[in-house]
């Protein structure tokens, strides 16, 4: 799967050619497709045509009817071939056809037993290969279902039925989505829309659904936009245009209308789809880049909010019209699969050479041509590991499915290989290393000697004007809202203290009756704790807002005066409320509020006092927020106008205008919040460090806060001359990539950073040769996630843009899941090495046994059917079970694997040759001994060299038992079964595979029907005991190797502990 591919929704990245020299045509032509048609209709006309509502959408019953009628919202795909046809295609392999030709020749020459035996054996081999390929395809299909895409929508559901929806396929809308004023400026209608919003699988969308989308979302279907706020959409995967396109709800009525709303792009990039009409004949439709009121399926929202009506799903979308060309593009194979292909090819050449030598020697010795031909082809089938690439794919896919059950969804198979090479993990602090539930623990304002505990000093918090002002600002400059359950049954302020911020002991998750940004929720939880009511519904309307961003590091709102009903932010009595990072707030304040409520000039000594109080809280690992308020200065700029307290702005102002309005404020105080570390994160960090993986924490918090939290997590924070354990965003701005690459070797914390700094950190680490994993959740994190070797997006809080760029998604947003994923990545690679060892040692042993027997002039010890049976064991369940061996818990003590490391290492080749030699030597010894177990009647005292069915049965069974013991030794390269390091029955699939193989072998030698096919005869208990003693030698020899290696490792480290700890 390619880097740009997505499991559930393939995106087409058109290759942009050189820019066009002419301006885009914006005139409206005669429409012939749904998007073209609806782009000319207004929102009301669109709703009327699709028989839906602009406020409430469809009813669930109507949506169900349309889903049954139109089918799921999925891109068209080719129907798979019937299983019987795919099974017959397995017979197209050259070696299989040669074996069938051998069977046909035997039949015509009267050797009916051989003909039937070869045909049956070939059928068994083909069946095993077919089952393997089928499992591989099903495993890959399961991967595509790991990342289901969702859509936020409004459906007309009565309040009594809402809980039923939540228990089925819907859930409460995420806290980061603002809906008010998108469809109506009425606060009541917006509130109703919020309560009715739901999250459903994108595949369940139908035409007429009312869909909501915001920054970072992927558009789930073709949508006619009915309301938008600062909405821009990235359509590069559809049109090739690199710049996000501004979107508007107005209909394209004429050429003039189209021009007036088009983005200011003089010469957009060209692509096969950019100038193409919407799924119609050239020149007949409105081009895709002109449809500024259509959001196309698969495109990504870069900024703003939007609402619209679904007009096309599945094959009826613009993506659906080009999906046929996508189906013809095969996903590239992973590097490991390509290396297995090359290995198989090289081994094929060697095998053909050895087989040709065997056939030539046999013919020179006067053996029958048909016999040597059949043996040669059978050896080719057994010796050439044609199943190796398939088993690699199955192992990777099954490993990914196991990782998904543990909370890590790998979106691309090559990423599994890279996981074992990761030696640096860059992690966000909030939500990944911590619980992402802030709780206010301390507060400070002037005239306080030091920050006080809010829960221990309730009188200070509720009696003083300064403390009450801090709470008031935190309440007003706040976008958190009641959760759907709390909104439908609101609690009083007195009872909210009991309901707010409870802990679910079963899951460890912290619950609140509020939803929104963690800092906003923490402040409202504090209000609940002290029984204070939410004031936002009782004060004047919010007339403007400056939203928080990682670059700005503060947010502010402007509340209109009671006398000013018009939504203007220039009223004489408007008041600004601001909260954010200390330095950003402090620079906007001229005065401060004393404990008794007086305003005093904020001079430099008092600013220093504020900074000391903030540093005191930050040193305890608290996140510090500053609060201020004051009258709005009269400016001439524009503003963001709102209809209610949590509305989304309808227009935007310049950065300068925003700064001018939030100046000359009164500083109120500080609040310290605590986001506790996740459970066992400190253990995960220690285990990663023990395995040679550095952990770097990236946070927007202050330096002292970051250091305090890092120490709690057990991260190395050592400040020594010439090195700095912490770098800030300002330090990064001043450093070049080369300087950062040099300094980063001693740095484990980056504080006061923005998403843009992540890209610089990744480049610096990669320039040193590090393999980097980077976490992120926002739109601005996407470039760094894509640049990193392993981009890790958050499953709960991450945007669709971040998930699109990532290689791995954490469904629980937990750092410990990264450790489990790296463990699995390492384990999968070593498991692949183990079954390669098993397959190659079996293949080499079979070839060398037949070659040596031929050179010594013996009759072939194994007939064609027996060789094909060995091939089934080599490529079948025993080999596959080695690929799913449980991961060794001590695997993290091994250093990360080099990206250029070969699969076939020197120790692996030595294991292959040792095991193959033991198998060949022991099997040949049994064969020679059994040939001489009877007297030669013509020469008294001389042993007979006549090969009987008993001789070949003993040889055949000896080889199979050798194979089983060899598979047992290949379960681990270093762990011993005898010393109890490797549980004998720890791999259930391996147990079943061995039992099945032994049962099959018993059938071959004891069931009369199979005796005739494989030319065997029954063995007694004494024979089996002798074979067990001989065949177990490969196990004892490998156990001895493991013991000697363990002794060497203990001597190397002195006391038996890993040198990395």
Curated annotation (Swiss-Prot):
Belongs to the cation transport ATPase (P-type) (TC 3.A.3) family. The lineage of its organism: Eukaryota, Fungi, Dikarya, Ascomycota, Pezizomycotina. The keyword Translocase applies. This is Calcium-transporting ATPase pmrA. Ca(2+) 2 binds at residues 875, 963. Residues 1-90, 132-343, 402-837, 933-945, 1011-1061 are cytoplasmic. Residues 110-114, 365-380, 859-911, 969-989 are lumenal. ATP binds at residues 430, 520, 579, 623, 752, 758, 780. GO terms for biological process: calcium ion transmembrane transport; calcium ion transport; fungal-type cell wall organization; intracellular calcium ion homeostasis; intracellular manganese ion homeostasis; macroautophagy; manganese ion transport; response to unfolded protein. SUPFAM superfamilies: Calcium ATPase, transduction domain A (SSF81653), Calcium ATPase, transmembrane domain M (SSF81665), HAD-like (SSF56784), Metal cation-transporting ATPase, ATP-binding domain N (SSF81660). Ca(2+) 1 binds at residues 381-382, 384, 386, 871, 875. Residues 30-39 have a biased composition (Low complexity). PROSITE patterns: ATPASE_E1_E2. The active site is at 428 (4-aspartylphosphate intermediate). It is an enzyme of class 7 (translocase). Induction: Expression is induced by the unfolded protein response (UPR) during ER stress. Disruption phenotype: Leads to osmotically suppressible basal growth defects and cationic tolerance associated with increased expression of calcineurin pathway genes. Results in hypersensitivity to cell wall inhibitors but does not affect virulence. Leads to severe polarity defect, hypersensitivity to ER stress, and attenuated virulence; when srcA is also deleted. The gene is pmrA. It comes from the Eukaryota. Its cofactor is Mg(2+). Mg(2+) binds at residues 428, 430, 777. Magnesium-dependent enzyme that catalyzes the hydrolysis of ATP coupled with the transport of calcium from the cytosol to the Golgi apparatus lumen. Involved calcium homeostasis and both conidiation and polarized growth. Its activity is coupled to the unfolded protein response (UPR) and Ca(2+) import into the Golgi apparatus is important for virulence, cell wall biosynthesis, and resistance to antifungal compounds that inhibit Ca2+ signaling. It comes from Aspergillus fumigatus (strain ATCC MYA-4609 / CBS 101355 / FGSC A1100 / Af293) (Neosartorya fumigata).
């Amino acid at each position: 799967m390619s880097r740009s591919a997505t499991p559930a929704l393939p995106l087409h990245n058109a290759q942009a050619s050189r820019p066009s020299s002419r301006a885009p045509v914006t005139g409206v032509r005669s429409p012939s497709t749904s998007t073209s048609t609806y782009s000319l209709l207004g929102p009301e006309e669109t709703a009327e045509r699709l028989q839906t509502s602009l406020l409430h959408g469809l009813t669930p019953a109507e949506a169900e009817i349309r889903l049954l009628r139109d089918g799921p919202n999925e891109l068209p795909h080719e129907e798979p071939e019937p299983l019987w046809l795919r099974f017959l295609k397995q017979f197209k392999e050259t070696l299989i056809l040669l074996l069938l030709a051998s069977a046909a020749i035997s039949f015509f020459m009267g050797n009916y037993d051989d003909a039937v035996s070869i045909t049956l054996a070939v059928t068994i081999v083909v069946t095993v290969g077919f089952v393997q390929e089928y499992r591989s395809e099903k495993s890959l299909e399961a991967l595509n279902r790991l990342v289901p895409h969702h859509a936020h929508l409004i459906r007309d559901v009565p309040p009594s039925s809402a809980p039923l929806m939540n228990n089925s396929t819907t859930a409460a809308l995420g806290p980061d989505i603002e809906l008010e004023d998108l469809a109506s400026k009425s606060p009541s209608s917006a509130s109703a829309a919020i309560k009715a919003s739901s999250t459903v699988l994108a595949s369940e969308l139908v035409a007429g659904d009312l869909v909501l989308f915001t920054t970072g979302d992927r558009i789930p279907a073709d949508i006619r936009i009915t309301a938008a706020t600062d909405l821009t959409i990235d359509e590069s995967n559809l049109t090739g245009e690199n710049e996000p396109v501004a979107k508007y709800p107005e209909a394209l009525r004429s050429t003039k209308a189209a021009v007036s709303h088009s983005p200011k792009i003089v010469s957009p990039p060209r692509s096969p789809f950019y100038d193409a009409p919407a799924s119609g004949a050239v020149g007949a439709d409105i081009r895709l880049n002109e449809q500024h009121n259509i959001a196309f399926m698969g495109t990504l929202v870069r900024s703003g909010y939007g609402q619209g009506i679904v007009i096309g799903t599945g094959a009826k979308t613009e993506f659906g019209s080009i999906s046929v060309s996508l189906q013809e593009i095969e996903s590239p194979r992973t590097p490991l699969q390509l290396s297995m292909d090359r290995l198989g090819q090289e081994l094929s050449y060697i095998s053909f050479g050895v087989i040709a030598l065997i056939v030539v020697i046999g013919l020179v010795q006067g053996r029958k041509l048909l016999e040597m031909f059949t043996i040669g082809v059978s050896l080719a089938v057994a010796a050439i590991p044609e199943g190796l690439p398939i088993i690699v794919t199955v192992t990777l896919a099954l490993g990914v499915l196991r990782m998904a059950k543990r909370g890590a969804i790998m979106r691309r198979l090559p990423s599994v290989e890279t996981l074992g090479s990761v030696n640096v993990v860059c992690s966000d602090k909030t939500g990944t290393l911590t619980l992402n539930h802030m709780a206010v623990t301390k507060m400070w304002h002037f005239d306080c000697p030091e920050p006080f505990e809010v829960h221990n000093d309730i009188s200070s918090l509720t009696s003083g004007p300064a403390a009450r002002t801090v709470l008031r600002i935190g309440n007003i400059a706040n976008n958190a809202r009641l959760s759907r359950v709390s909104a439908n049954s609101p609690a009083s302020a007195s009872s909210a203290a009991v309901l707010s911020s409870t802990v679910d002991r079963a899951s460890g998750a912290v619950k609140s009756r509020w939803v929104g940004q963690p800092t906003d929720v923490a402040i409202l939880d504090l209000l609940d704790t002290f029984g204070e009511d939410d004031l936002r519904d009782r004060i004047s309307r919010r007339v403007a807002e400056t939203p928080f961003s990682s670059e700005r590091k503060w947010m502010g709102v402007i509340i209109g005066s009671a006398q000013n009903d018009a939504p203007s932010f220039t009223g004489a009595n408007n008041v600004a409320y601001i909260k954010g990072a200390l330095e950003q707030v402090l620079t906007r304040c001229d005065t401060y509020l004393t404990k008794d409520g007086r305003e005093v000039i904020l001079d430099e000594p008092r600013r220093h006092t504020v900074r000391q109080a903030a540093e005191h809280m930050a040193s305890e690992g608290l996140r510090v927020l500053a609060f201020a308020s004051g009258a709005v200065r009269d400016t001439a700029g524009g503003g963001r106008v709102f209809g209610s307290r949590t509305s989304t702005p309808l227009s935007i102002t310049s950065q300068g205008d925003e700064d001018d309005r939030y100046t000359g404020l009164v500083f109120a105080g500080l609040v310290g919040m605590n986001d506790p570390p996740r459970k066992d994160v400190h253990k995960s960090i220690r285990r990663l460090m023990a395995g040679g993986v550095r952990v770097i924490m990236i946070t927007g918090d202050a330096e002292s806060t970051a250091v305090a939290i890092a120490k709690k997590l057990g991260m190395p924070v050592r400040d020594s001359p010439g090195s700095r354990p912490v770098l800030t965003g300002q330090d990064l701005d001043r450093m070049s990539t080369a300087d950062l690459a040099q300094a980063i070797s001693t740095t484990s914390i980056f504080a006061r950073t923005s998403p843009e700094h992540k890209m610089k950190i990744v480049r610096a680490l990669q320039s040193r040769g590090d393999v980097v994993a980077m976490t992120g959740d926002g739109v601005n994190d996407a470039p760094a996630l894509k640049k990193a070797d392993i981009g890790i997006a958050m499953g709960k809080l991450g945007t669709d843009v971040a998930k699109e760029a990532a290689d791995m998604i954490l469904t629980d947003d937990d750092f410990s899941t990264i450790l489990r994923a790296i463990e699995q990545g390492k384990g999968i690679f070593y498991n692949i090495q183990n079954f390669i060892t098993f397959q190659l040692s079996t293949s080499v042993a079979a070839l060398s046994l037949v070659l040596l027997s031929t050179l010594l002039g013996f009759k072939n010890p194994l007939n064609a059917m027996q060789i094909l049976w060995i091939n089934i064991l080599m490529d079948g369940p025993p080999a596959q079970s080695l690929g799913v061996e449980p991961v060794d818990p001590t695997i993290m003590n091994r250093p990360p694997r080099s990206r250029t490391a070969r699969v076939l290492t020197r120790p692996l080749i030595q294991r292959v040759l040792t095991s193959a030699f033991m198998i060949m030597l022991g099997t040949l010894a049994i064969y020679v001994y059994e040939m001489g177990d009877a007297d030669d009647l013509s020469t008294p005292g001389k042993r007979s060299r006549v090969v009987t069915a008993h001789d070949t049965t003993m040889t055949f069974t000896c080889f199979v038992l050798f194979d089983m013991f060899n598979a047992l030794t290949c379960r681990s390269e270093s762990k011993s079964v005898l010393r109890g390091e490797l549980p004998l029955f720890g791999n259930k699939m391996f147990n079943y595979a061995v039992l099945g193989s032994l049962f099959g072998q018993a059938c071959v030698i004891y069931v009369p029907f199979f005796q005739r096919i494989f030319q065997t005869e029954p063995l007694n208990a004494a024979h089996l005991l002798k074979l067990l003693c001989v065949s177990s030698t490969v196990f004892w020899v490998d156990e001895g190797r493991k013991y000697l290696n363990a002794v060497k490792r203990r001597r190397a480290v002195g006391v038996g502990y890993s040198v990395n700890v």
